[in-house]
UniProtKB/Swiss-Prot annotation:
Family (UniProt): Belongs to the DEFL family.
Record's keyword terms, sorted: Antibiotic, Antimicrobial, Fungicide, Plant defense, Pyrrolidone carboxylic acid
Gene3D superfamilies: Knottin, scorpion toxin-like
Assembly with partners or alone: Forms oligomers in its native state.
Cell inner membrane is among the record's keywords: no
One example of a Gene Ontology biological process annotation: killing of cells of another organism
Name used for this protein in its record: Defensin-like protein 2
Taxonomic superkingdom: Eukaryota
Source organism: Brassica campestris
Length: 27
């Protein structure tokens, strides 16, 4: 699963979940 990337560099939550931070996907 791809995770969301915060500006702090830490991953938070699952990318694509309810379109949450879909522009910050970590591959």
């Amino acid at each position: 699963q791809k995770l969301c990337e915060r500006p702090s560099g830490t991953x938070s939550g699952v990318c694509g979940n309810n379109n949450a931070c879909k522009n910050q996907c970590i591959r």
